[in-house]
Amino acid sequence: MLGPPRRGPAYKTKLCALWQRGNCNRDTCSFAHGHGDIRRPPSSRGAFTHHPGRRDYRAGDFRGRIDRRFSPRRRHSPGRESRGHRPLYDRRPSSRERDSSYSRSPSRKSERRHEKKTDDGETNSSRSLSLSDNNDEKKKDKFSSGDEKEDHEKQLKQIRLDMEALRDDKTQMEVILDEKIDEVRKISSKVNDLEVQLRREKDECHRMTSKMKKFIKAHARFLKAQEEVKRSQARFERLGDLLASDILKRGANEEGSSVNEDLNERSPNTAATKKRSIPYSTSEEAKAVKKRRERDSDTMTRSDKYRSDVTDFDKTSKGTEATKSLYLKKKLWEDEKSKLGANIFTEKVKGSPVRHVLPSTGMAAHAIDDLNEAIELEDRHESIDALLENDADDKTRSPAIPLQPPPVVQNAYEQYEGDDEEVDVE
Protein backbone atom coordinates (compact mmCIF):
# COMPACT_ATOMS: atom_id res chain seq x y z
CA MET A 1 0.00 0.00 0.00
CA LEU A 2 1.38 3.31 -0.95
CA GLY A 3 1.86 6.02 1.63
CA PRO A 4 0.79 9.62 1.35
CA PRO A 5 2.60 11.73 -1.19
CA ARG A 6 5.40 13.99 -0.15
CA ARG A 7 4.43 17.50 0.66
CA GLY A 8 6.35 20.43 -0.49
CA PRO A 9 7.33 23.41 1.61
CA ALA A 10 4.43 24.67 3.72
CA TYR A 11 3.43 28.23 3.07
CA LYS A 12 1.35 29.86 5.84
CA THR A 13 -0.89 32.23 3.97
CA LYS A 14 -3.69 32.72 6.58
CA LEU A 15 -3.96 33.49 10.24
CA CYS A 16 -5.06 30.77 12.63
CA ALA A 17 -8.60 31.33 13.91
CA LEU A 18 -7.92 29.41 17.13
CA TRP A 19 -4.81 31.47 17.68
CA GLN A 20 -6.87 34.64 17.31
CA ARG A 21 -9.22 33.34 20.04
CA GLY A 22 -6.29 32.27 22.16
CA ASN A 23 -7.08 28.50 22.14
CA CYS A 24 -4.57 27.08 19.61
CA ASN A 25 -2.15 24.70 21.35
CA ARG A 26 -0.81 22.85 18.30
CA ASP A 27 2.92 22.97 17.80
CA THR A 28 2.78 22.08 14.10
CA CYS A 29 -0.06 24.35 13.06
CA SER A 30 -0.42 24.93 9.32
CA PHE A 31 -1.74 28.46 9.89
CA ALA A 32 0.23 31.55 10.74
CA HIS A 33 0.39 32.65 14.35
CA GLY A 34 0.92 36.28 13.48
CA HIS A 35 1.53 38.47 10.44
CA GLY A 36 5.24 37.66 10.50
CA ASP A 37 4.58 33.99 9.75
CA ILE A 38 2.54 34.74 6.65
CA ARG A 39 4.44 33.84 3.46
CA ARG A 40 3.16 34.38 -0.02
CA PRO A 41 4.01 31.78 -2.71
CA PRO A 42 5.69 33.04 -5.91
CA SER A 43 3.24 34.04 -8.57
CA SER A 44 3.07 31.75 -11.58
CA ARG A 45 1.09 32.07 -14.75
CA GLY A 46 -0.12 28.53 -14.78
CA ALA A 47 -1.36 28.52 -11.17
CA PHE A 48 -4.69 26.87 -10.61
CA THR A 49 -7.32 29.27 -9.39
CA HIS A 50 -10.47 28.12 -7.67
CA HIS A 51 -13.57 29.22 -9.47
CA PRO A 52 -16.75 29.86 -7.50
CA GLY A 53 -19.47 27.30 -8.11
CA ARG A 54 -17.05 24.46 -8.77
CA ARG A 55 -16.43 21.58 -6.41
CA ASP A 56 -13.22 21.84 -4.45
CA TYR A 57 -11.36 18.52 -4.58
CA ARG A 58 -8.31 19.80 -2.81
CA ALA A 59 -9.60 19.04 0.65
CA GLY A 60 -10.31 15.62 2.05
CA ASP A 61 -8.37 12.53 2.86
CA PHE A 62 -5.85 10.88 0.49
CA ARG A 63 -7.22 7.45 1.22
CA GLY A 64 -10.09 8.11 -1.11
CA ARG A 65 -7.70 8.99 -3.94
CA ILE A 66 -5.47 6.01 -3.34
CA ASP A 67 -8.36 3.54 -3.40
CA ARG A 68 -10.16 5.32 -6.21
CA ARG A 69 -8.97 2.82 -8.81
CA PHE A 70 -10.76 0.03 -6.98
CA SER A 71 -14.01 1.96 -6.68
CA PRO A 72 -16.71 1.68 -9.39
CA ARG A 73 -16.80 4.25 -12.08
CA ARG A 74 -19.05 7.19 -11.54
CA ARG A 75 -22.08 7.67 -13.67
CA HIS A 76 -22.42 10.58 -16.01
CA SER A 77 -24.51 13.45 -14.82
CA PRO A 78 -26.43 14.98 -17.73
CA GLY A 79 -26.84 18.18 -15.79
CA ARG A 80 -23.14 18.58 -15.18
CA GLU A 81 -22.30 17.67 -18.77
CA SER A 82 -24.82 20.16 -20.06
CA ARG A 83 -23.08 22.82 -18.07
CA GLY A 84 -19.75 21.86 -19.61
CA HIS A 85 -18.34 19.91 -16.70
CA ARG A 86 -16.75 16.55 -17.26
CA PRO A 87 -15.96 13.85 -14.74
CA LEU A 88 -12.44 13.41 -13.53
CA TYR A 89 -11.94 9.90 -14.86
CA ASP A 90 -12.98 11.02 -18.37
CA ARG A 91 -11.22 14.30 -18.29
CA ARG A 92 -9.00 15.10 -21.25
CA PRO A 93 -6.55 17.90 -21.52
CA SER A 94 -8.19 21.07 -22.61
CA SER A 95 -6.98 23.52 -25.16
CA ARG A 96 -5.10 25.37 -22.48
CA GLU A 97 -3.11 22.27 -21.49
CA ARG A 98 -2.47 21.10 -25.06
CA ASP A 99 0.31 22.39 -27.20
CA SER A 100 -2.20 23.89 -29.59
CA SER A 101 -3.43 26.13 -26.85
CA TYR A 102 -0.24 28.07 -26.87
CA SER A 103 -0.69 28.82 -30.54
CA ARG A 104 -4.16 30.17 -30.01
CA SER A 105 -3.14 32.55 -27.22
CA PRO A 106 -1.28 35.62 -28.47
CA SER A 107 0.98 35.82 -25.48
CA ARG A 108 1.77 32.14 -25.61
CA LYS A 109 2.31 32.41 -29.33
CA SER A 110 4.93 35.08 -28.98
CA GLU A 111 6.68 33.13 -26.24
CA ARG A 112 6.54 30.00 -28.38
CA ARG A 113 8.03 31.78 -31.31
CA HIS A 114 10.76 33.13 -29.11
CA GLU A 115 11.43 29.74 -27.63
CA LYS A 116 11.43 28.14 -31.03
CA LYS A 117 13.97 30.57 -32.19
CA THR A 118 16.32 29.75 -29.38
CA ASP A 119 16.06 26.04 -28.81
CA ASP A 120 13.26 23.49 -29.02
CA GLY A 121 14.68 21.41 -26.15
CA GLU A 122 14.82 24.37 -23.87
CA THR A 123 11.21 25.15 -24.52
CA ASN A 124 10.10 21.67 -23.59
CA SER A 125 12.10 21.71 -20.36
CA SER A 126 10.69 25.06 -19.31
CA ARG A 127 7.21 23.83 -20.07
CA SER A 128 7.70 20.74 -17.91
CA LEU A 129 9.06 22.84 -15.05
CA SER A 130 6.06 25.16 -15.16
CA LEU A 131 3.69 22.20 -15.08
CA SER A 132 5.43 20.69 -12.07
CA ASP A 133 5.27 24.04 -10.29
CA ASN A 134 1.57 24.29 -11.01
CA ASN A 135 0.99 20.82 -9.66
CA ASP A 136 2.87 21.64 -6.46
CA GLU A 137 0.88 24.79 -6.00
CA LYS A 138 -2.36 22.90 -6.49
CA LYS A 139 -1.34 20.33 -3.92
CA LYS A 140 -0.45 23.08 -1.46
CA ASP A 141 -3.79 24.77 -2.00
CA LYS A 142 -5.57 21.46 -1.44
CA PHE A 143 -3.69 20.78 1.77
CA SER A 144 -4.32 24.29 3.11
CA SER A 145 -8.02 24.14 2.25
CA GLY A 146 -8.32 20.68 3.91
CA ASP A 147 -6.72 21.96 7.10
CA GLU A 148 -9.04 24.94 7.13
CA LYS A 149 -12.03 22.68 6.66
CA GLU A 150 -10.95 20.45 9.51
CA ASP A 151 -10.48 23.47 11.72
CA HIS A 152 -13.89 24.78 10.78
CA GLU A 153 -15.48 21.42 11.48
CA LYS A 154 -13.81 21.26 14.86
CA GLN A 155 -14.97 24.77 15.62
CA LEU A 156 -18.47 23.86 14.50
CA LYS A 157 -18.50 20.78 16.72
CA GLN A 158 -17.26 22.84 19.63
CA ILE A 159 -19.93 25.45 19.00
CA ARG A 160 -22.58 22.73 18.88
CA LEU A 161 -21.34 21.28 22.14
CA ASP A 162 -21.36 24.74 23.66
CA MET A 163 -24.90 25.28 22.40
CA GLU A 164 -26.05 21.98 23.90
CA ALA A 165 -24.41 22.87 27.19
CA LEU A 166 -26.05 26.27 27.08
CA ARG A 167 -29.41 24.65 26.37
CA ASP A 168 -28.94 22.33 29.33
CA ASP A 169 -28.02 25.30 31.47
CA LYS A 170 -31.07 27.13 30.16
CA THR A 171 -33.40 24.28 31.11
CA GLN A 172 -31.80 24.05 34.54
CA MET A 173 -32.11 27.79 35.00
CA GLU A 174 -35.77 27.65 33.94
CA VAL A 175 -36.43 24.93 36.51
CA ILE A 176 -34.61 26.94 39.16
CA LEU A 177 -36.56 30.04 38.11
CA ASP A 178 -39.87 28.19 38.50
CA GLU A 179 -38.80 26.99 41.94
CA LYS A 180 -37.79 30.50 42.93
CA ILE A 181 -41.12 31.86 41.69
CA ASP A 182 -42.95 29.30 43.83
CA GLU A 183 -40.80 30.25 46.82
CA VAL A 184 -41.53 33.93 46.20
CA ARG A 185 -45.26 33.21 46.14
CA LYS A 186 -45.06 31.24 49.38
CA ILE A 187 -42.97 33.92 51.05
CA SER A 188 -45.34 36.66 49.85
CA SER A 189 -48.32 34.74 51.27
CA LYS A 190 -46.48 34.30 54.58
CA VAL A 191 -45.62 37.99 54.61
CA ASN A 192 -49.28 38.88 54.04
CA ASP A 193 -50.34 36.58 56.88
CA LEU A 194 -47.73 38.09 59.17
CA GLU A 195 -48.88 41.59 58.25
CA VAL A 196 -52.48 40.69 59.10
CA GLN A 197 -51.34 39.14 62.39
CA LEU A 198 -49.23 42.20 63.15
CA ARG A 199 -52.23 44.46 62.59
CA ARG A 200 -54.30 42.33 64.93
CA GLU A 201 -51.57 42.40 67.57
CA LYS A 202 -51.30 46.17 67.23
CA ASP A 203 -55.04 46.56 67.69
CA GLU A 204 -54.97 44.23 70.70
CA CYS A 205 -52.02 46.14 72.16
CA HIS A 206 -53.86 49.42 71.65
CA ARG A 207 -56.93 48.04 73.40
CA MET A 208 -54.85 46.67 76.26
CA THR A 209 -53.02 49.96 76.73
CA SER A 210 -56.31 51.86 76.77
CA LYS A 211 -57.74 49.40 79.29
CA MET A 212 -54.62 49.70 81.43
CA LYS A 213 -54.85 53.48 81.36
CA LYS A 214 -58.51 53.33 82.35
CA PHE A 215 -57.70 50.87 85.12
CA ILE A 216 -54.90 53.09 86.42
CA LYS A 217 -57.23 56.10 86.42
CA ALA A 218 -59.94 54.12 88.18
CA HIS A 219 -57.42 52.85 90.73
CA ALA A 220 -56.22 56.39 91.39
CA ARG A 221 -59.82 57.51 91.86
CA PHE A 222 -60.42 54.56 94.17
CA LEU A 223 -57.41 55.51 96.29
CA LYS A 224 -58.62 59.11 96.45
CA ALA A 225 -62.08 57.93 97.42
CA GLN A 226 -60.58 55.72 100.12
CA GLU A 227 -58.63 58.66 101.50
CA GLU A 228 -61.75 60.82 101.43
CA VAL A 229 -63.70 58.05 103.17
CA LYS A 230 -61.04 57.81 105.84
CA ARG A 231 -61.04 61.56 106.34
CA SER A 232 -64.84 61.71 106.44
CA GLN A 233 -64.91 58.73 108.82
CA ALA A 234 -62.48 60.44 111.16
CA ARG A 235 -64.49 63.65 110.92
CA PHE A 236 -67.70 61.74 111.58
CA GLU A 237 -66.15 60.04 114.59
CA ARG A 238 -65.15 63.39 116.01
CA LEU A 239 -68.64 64.75 115.39
CA GLY A 240 -70.17 61.68 117.05
CA ASP A 241 -67.94 62.11 120.08
CA LEU A 242 -68.84 65.78 120.29
CA LEU A 243 -72.54 64.97 119.90
CA ALA A 244 -72.43 62.31 122.60
CA SER A 245 -70.59 64.61 124.96
CA ASP A 246 -73.06 67.44 124.23
CA ILE A 247 -76.01 65.12 124.87
CA LEU A 248 -74.53 63.95 128.14
CA LYS A 249 -73.70 67.47 129.25
CA ARG A 250 -77.14 68.74 128.29
CA GLY A 251 -78.85 65.89 130.15
CA ALA A 252 -76.74 66.50 133.24
CA ASN A 253 -77.39 70.24 133.10
CA GLU A 254 -81.13 69.73 132.67
CA GLU A 255 -81.31 67.31 135.57
CA GLY A 256 -79.26 69.68 137.70
CA SER A 257 -81.50 72.58 136.74
CA SER A 258 -84.60 70.51 137.54
CA VAL A 259 -83.17 69.71 140.97
CA ASN A 260 -82.41 73.36 141.57
CA GLU A 261 -85.89 74.36 140.44
CA ASP A 262 -87.38 71.78 142.78
CA LEU A 263 -85.36 73.19 145.62
CA ASN A 264 -86.32 76.74 144.72
CA GLU A 265 -89.96 75.80 144.51
CA ARG A 266 -89.80 74.06 147.83
CA SER A 267 -88.01 76.90 149.61
CA PRO A 268 -90.92 79.43 149.48
CA ASN A 269 -93.26 76.76 150.79
CA THR A 270 -91.23 76.27 153.97
CA ALA A 271 -93.02 79.17 155.58
CA ALA A 272 -96.37 77.87 154.48
CA THR A 273 -95.68 74.46 155.91
CA LYS A 274 -96.02 75.94 159.32
CA LYS A 275 -99.63 76.73 158.47
CA ARG A 276 -100.35 73.16 157.27
CA SER A 277 -102.70 71.21 159.42
CA ILE A 278 -101.29 67.79 158.44
CA PRO A 279 -98.07 67.01 160.32
CA TYR A 280 -95.18 65.31 158.45
CA SER A 281 -92.42 63.52 160.11
CA THR A 282 -88.92 64.68 159.62
CA SER A 283 -87.87 61.17 158.73
CA GLU A 284 -89.97 61.23 155.56
CA GLU A 285 -88.49 64.57 154.48
CA ALA A 286 -85.06 63.21 155.10
CA LYS A 287 -85.88 60.23 152.95
CA ALA A 288 -87.05 62.51 150.12
CA VAL A 289 -83.90 64.59 150.30
CA LYS A 290 -81.82 61.45 150.33
CA LYS A 291 -83.69 60.19 147.31
CA ARG A 292 -83.00 63.43 145.43
CA ARG A 293 -79.32 63.23 146.25
CA GLU A 294 -79.12 59.64 145.07
CA ARG A 295 -80.76 60.63 141.80
CA ASP A 296 -78.29 63.45 141.29
CA SER A 297 -75.36 61.16 141.99
CA ASP A 298 -76.91 58.62 139.63
CA THR A 299 -76.99 61.16 136.80
CA MET A 300 -73.36 62.05 137.39
CA THR A 301 -72.24 58.44 137.40
CA ARG A 302 -74.36 57.80 134.33
CA SER A 303 -72.59 60.58 132.39
CA ASP A 304 -69.25 59.12 133.38
CA LYS A 305 -70.45 55.73 132.34
CA TYR A 306 -71.56 57.09 128.95
CA ARG A 307 -68.15 58.56 128.34
CA SER A 308 -66.36 55.37 129.35
CA ASP A 309 -68.67 53.32 127.13
CA VAL A 310 -68.02 55.60 124.18
CA THR A 311 -64.27 55.34 124.61
CA ASP A 312 -64.46 51.55 125.04
CA PHE A 313 -66.62 51.25 121.97
CA ASP A 314 -64.19 53.36 119.92
CA LYS A 315 -61.29 51.26 121.08
CA THR A 316 -62.83 47.84 120.60
CA SER A 317 -64.98 48.33 117.50
CA LYS A 318 -63.97 49.85 114.16
CA GLY A 319 -67.49 50.06 112.69
CA THR A 320 -69.24 52.81 110.89
CA GLU A 321 -70.75 55.90 112.41
CA ALA A 322 -74.30 54.54 112.07
CA THR A 323 -73.48 51.57 114.33
CA LYS A 324 -71.84 53.91 116.85
CA SER A 325 -74.88 56.16 116.97
CA LEU A 326 -77.13 53.13 117.41
CA TYR A 327 -74.91 51.90 120.19
CA LEU A 328 -75.07 55.25 121.99
CA LYS A 329 -78.86 55.44 121.66
CA LYS A 330 -79.20 51.91 122.96
CA LYS A 331 -77.03 52.75 125.96
CA LEU A 332 -79.11 55.82 126.70
CA TRP A 333 -82.27 53.78 126.53
CA GLU A 334 -80.91 51.05 128.83
CA ASP A 335 -79.71 53.59 131.38
CA GLU A 336 -83.03 55.39 131.35
CA LYS A 337 -84.79 52.08 131.78
CA SER A 338 -82.59 51.09 134.71
CA LYS A 339 -83.18 54.47 136.28
CA LEU A 340 -86.94 54.28 136.08
CA GLY A 341 -87.18 50.57 136.89
CA ALA A 342 -89.61 48.19 135.34
CA ASN A 343 -92.43 49.43 133.12
CA ILE A 344 -94.85 47.51 135.30
CA PHE A 345 -94.48 50.08 138.02
CA THR A 346 -95.40 52.85 135.59
CA GLU A 347 -98.45 50.95 134.37
CA LYS A 348 -99.58 50.35 137.95
CA VAL A 349 -99.14 53.99 138.69
CA LYS A 350 -101.17 54.93 135.61
CA GLY A 351 -104.03 52.61 136.56
CA SER A 352 -104.08 53.45 140.25
CA PRO A 353 -106.69 55.99 141.46
CA VAL A 354 -104.21 57.63 143.80
CA ARG A 355 -103.47 60.25 141.18
CA HIS A 356 -106.89 61.80 141.68
CA VAL A 357 -107.46 60.97 145.34
CA LEU A 358 -104.22 62.13 146.91
CA PRO A 359 -104.08 65.73 147.84
CA SER A 360 -101.75 68.10 146.13
CA THR A 361 -99.75 68.85 149.24
CA GLY A 362 -96.61 67.39 150.67
CA MET A 363 -95.37 63.98 149.59
CA ALA A 364 -98.44 63.27 147.49
CA ALA A 365 -97.60 66.15 145.19
CA HIS A 366 -94.03 64.91 144.85
CA ALA A 367 -95.30 61.42 144.06
CA ILE A 368 -97.52 62.81 141.32
CA ASP A 369 -94.57 64.77 139.97
CA ASP A 370 -92.46 61.60 139.86
CA LEU A 371 -95.25 59.78 138.10
CA ASN A 372 -95.59 62.45 135.41
CA GLU A 373 -91.84 62.50 134.93
CA ALA A 374 -91.84 58.74 134.44
CA ILE A 375 -94.60 59.01 131.83
CA GLU A 376 -92.70 61.68 129.93
CA LEU A 377 -89.52 59.61 130.00
CA GLU A 378 -91.41 56.61 128.69
CA ASP A 379 -92.76 58.68 125.81
CA ARG A 380 -89.26 59.86 125.11
CA HIS A 381 -87.97 56.28 125.07
CA GLU A 382 -90.68 55.30 122.63
CA SER A 383 -89.50 58.05 120.32
CA ILE A 384 -85.93 56.76 120.75
CA ASP A 385 -87.10 53.24 119.79
CA ALA A 386 -88.72 54.63 116.68
CA LEU A 387 -85.48 56.40 115.82
CA LEU A 388 -83.57 53.15 116.31
CA GLU A 389 -85.89 51.31 113.95
CA ASN A 390 -85.63 54.09 111.36
CA ASP A 391 -81.84 53.98 111.61
CA ALA A 392 -81.86 50.21 111.17
CA ASP A 393 -84.00 50.57 108.05
CA ASP A 394 -82.04 53.52 106.63
CA LYS A 395 -78.47 52.29 107.00
CA THR A 396 -77.70 53.34 103.45
CA ARG A 397 -78.46 56.99 104.15
CA SER A 398 -75.74 59.60 104.45
CA PRO A 399 -73.83 59.26 107.75
CA ALA A 400 -72.84 62.90 107.73
CA ILE A 401 -76.27 64.05 109.11
CA PRO A 402 -75.87 64.66 112.86
CA LEU A 403 -78.11 62.76 115.25
CA GLN A 404 -81.06 64.56 116.76
CA PRO A 405 -80.61 65.13 120.48
CA PRO A 406 -83.28 63.70 122.77
CA PRO A 407 -86.06 66.09 123.74
CA VAL A 408 -85.37 68.33 126.68
CA VAL A 409 -86.95 67.17 129.89
CA GLN A 410 -89.78 69.55 130.68
CA ASN A 411 -90.30 70.71 134.20
CA ALA A 412 -92.89 68.37 135.65
CA TYR A 413 -93.89 70.83 138.32
CA GLU A 414 -95.18 73.66 136.11
CA GLN A 415 -98.58 72.10 135.57
CA TYR A 416 -99.16 71.87 139.31
CA GLU A 417 -98.15 75.41 140.25
CA GLY A 418 -101.79 76.62 140.51
CA ASP A 419 -102.97 73.56 142.47
CA ASP A 420 -100.90 74.24 145.57
CA GLU A 421 -102.98 75.03 148.60
CA GLU A 422 -101.95 76.86 151.69
CA VAL A 423 -102.76 75.09 154.90
CA ASP A 424 -102.46 76.63 158.33
CA VAL A 425 -100.45 74.48 160.66
CA GLU A 426 -101.33 74.83 164.29
Curated annotation (Swiss-Prot):
Residues 416-426 have a biased composition (Acidic residues). Residues 255-272 have a biased composition (Polar residues). Residues 34-155, 253-317, 390-426 are annotated as: Disordered. SUPFAM superfamilies: CCCH zinc finger. Residues 54-70, 78-101, 108-120, 135-155, 284-317 have a biased composition (Basic and acidic residues). A zinc finger (C3H1-type) spans 10-36. Signal peptide: none annotated. Residues 124-133 have a biased composition (Low complexity). One of its GO terms (molecular function) is DNA binding. Residues 144-245 form a coiled coil. InterPro entries: Znf_C3H13/40 (IPR045868), Znf_CCCH (IPR000571), Znf_CCCH_sf (IPR036855). Keywords: Coiled coil, DNA-binding, Metal-binding, Zinc, Zinc-finger. This is Zinc finger CCCH domain-containing protein 13. It comes from Oryza sativa subsp. japonica.
